[in-house]
């Protein structure tokens, strides 16, 4: 067991600046948790990557600060994270030289955004605009100003906006504060502003739309009701017409029935003499057996024909 634990102990015993990626990859979650518990941490993380980060940060805190990575880790963990503001101002502090000869010294800024020997400072300075840069590059001096001008502190303002860097010289602190306040509240405009804000315009448009929508809904509802009433009236009229036509058809059928009966009787009466002639011819052809028939049977035969014709009608 000691053989398996000794490599982790030797890795964790190394100073932070001597640790390599291979050493960190050999660490396990249990080794990191044990190291953190031994150092006094109550609840170390169960995640391996987080536990390794906790070990590195703890070692950075315990080790003395220097210019190596351990010192950087210590500075980051001990000091609170400071987010760079969108608008930064650098003010000039009065020095002993200002009291003596009226000169103002600017501190050196090694950043990429700082511009040395800016021609704009000549416009804002009010003096001759002549600059002298020393050999060491630590200080730049400007021409002396009057006591009224030097009483108010004037500095340089750098603005980072939409990926661009703008540097302005000769900005007083009050003006810088007002610009920062305006940048912090971009939506709040003055009361006597020329243009209305986009939110107010959108609110007015939305209110107008909300007023128009109920009116359109009421118009649609009224039109649907009117169409429904018209449809019901049309249905009633069509039903009434249908009933009237039906009654007319019934009356026409009732009127046609007597005419049909009279015509059938006329046809029967017209056909009766023909039937008698045909019957007499049949009697002449057949001979005695038919002559022997009684007159009652002869009288019954036309009746039979009448009954058949009546059934056919």
Swiss-Prot record:
Keywords: Developmental protein, Nucleus. It comes from the Eukaryota. Signal peptide: none annotated. A motif (Nuclear localization signal) lies at residues 234-241. Residues 243-256 have a biased composition (Basic residues). The keyword Magnesium does not apply. Disruption phenotype: Plants lacking both TIFY4A and TIFY4B have larger leaves and cotyledon laminae, a dome-shaped leaf curvature and shortened siliques. InterPro entries: CCT_CS (IPR018467), TIFY/JAZ (IPR040390), Tify_dom (IPR010399). A motif (Jas) lies at residues 232-254. GO terms for cellular component: nucleus. Redundant with TIFY 4B/PPD2. Belongs to the TIFY/JAZ family. Interacts with AFPH2/NINJA. This is Protein TIFY 4A. It comes from Arabidopsis thaliana.
